[in-house]
């Protein structure tokens, strides 16, 4: 078992040259590229999803592996999930290849095994680099391809930083450099989450009420606020209706307000002043009734380096205080 610690970015513009320039300025240990095909499995009644597990078979020309990912945490684009890998023979994963204790019982495991079916797939080109950075080894992967489900397909264009060894502070420091590429933003949704939705098996993104945080400490309040903020950022980007976008912006501002309120209970974090400034800027955008200028401005903001770095700073603070 390993706990995968990674930071994911969604890419919205051509970063080929700027990424190449960045890579030329840091220490590359090795690099390669590979075409990957992934098929995700669950039962027709989504028993694995209810257990907060994701199961796939990944193949390339000379490689096949089954992976199960268990319940983890996503905060500010930082994904931390236990995962287990095993060789695979055939077209259906064998759950007995994984540790018994990750399942509620062997009877449950065997029942799920008998009902496994393919639900969706992802196919992409992965270019990856192993990087020596600030005393750590970090893998940078650039995935470009598509997710295919029964309801259609959607593009994959993602950067992922995975900590292989060393301290997570180096991971965040390199993520800050990537934010400077422009046209990238932190991604809280995994390929599997997006795939379930494309297969008609996951709930569509929707507006959510701010969570009740009475009786929890400041760090948990900040976590809740950041998650609320990022959820509605993604919702905003997926909507075309201006009214839905205005409602999403209201929720983004509420999430940020919760983070600011909770941070005020502490010795002021270094990112607090920048967040207050950002909150004021969003308040001005919320008052703008001119279409489509305010929407264009907000879309650009979501991909701006200083905006992404602010979210990264909050996520890094949360990781350091956990």
Predicted regions and their residues:
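Function-determining surface determinants
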Residues: 1-322
């Amino acid at each position: 078992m390993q706990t995968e610690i990674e930071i994911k970015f969604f890419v919205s513009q051509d970063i080929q040259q700027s990424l190449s320039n960045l890579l030329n300025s840091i220490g590359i240990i090795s690099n390669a590229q590979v075409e990957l095909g992934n098929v995700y499995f669950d039962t027709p009644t989504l028993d694995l999803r209810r257990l907060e597990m994701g199961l796939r078979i990944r193949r390339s020309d000379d490689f096949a592996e089954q992976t199960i990912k268990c319940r983890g945490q996503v905060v500010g684009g930082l994904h931390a999930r236990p995962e287990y890998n095993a060789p695979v023979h055939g077209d259906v994963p064998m759950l007995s290849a994984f540790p018994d204790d990750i399942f509620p019982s062997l009877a449950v495991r065997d029942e799920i095994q008998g009902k496994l079916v393919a639900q969706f797939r992802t196919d992409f080109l992965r270019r990856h680099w192993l990087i020596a950075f600030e005393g750590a080894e970090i893998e940078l992967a650039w995935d470009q391809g598509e997710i295919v489900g029964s309801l259609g397909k959607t593009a994959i264009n993602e950067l992922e930083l995975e900590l292989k060894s060393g301290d997570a502070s180096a991971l965040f420091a390199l993520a800050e450099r990537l934010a400077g590429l422009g046209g990238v933003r932190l991604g809280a949704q995994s390929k599997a989450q997006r795939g379930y939705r494309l297969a008609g098996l996951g709930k569509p993104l929707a507006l959510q009420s701010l969570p009740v945080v009475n009786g929890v400490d400041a760090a948990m309040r900040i976590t809740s606020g950041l998650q609320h903020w990022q959820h509605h950022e993604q919702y905003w980007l997926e909507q075309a209706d201006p009214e839905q976008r205005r409602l999403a912006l209201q929720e983004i501002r509420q999430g940020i307000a919760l983070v600011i309120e909770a941070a005020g209970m502490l010795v002021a974090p270094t990112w607090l002043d920048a967040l207050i400034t950002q909150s004021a800027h969003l308040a001005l955008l919320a008052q703008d009734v001119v279409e489509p200028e305010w929407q264009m401005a907000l879309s650009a903001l979501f991909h701006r380096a200083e905006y992404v770095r602010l979210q990264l700073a909050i996520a890094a603070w949360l990781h350091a205080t956990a």
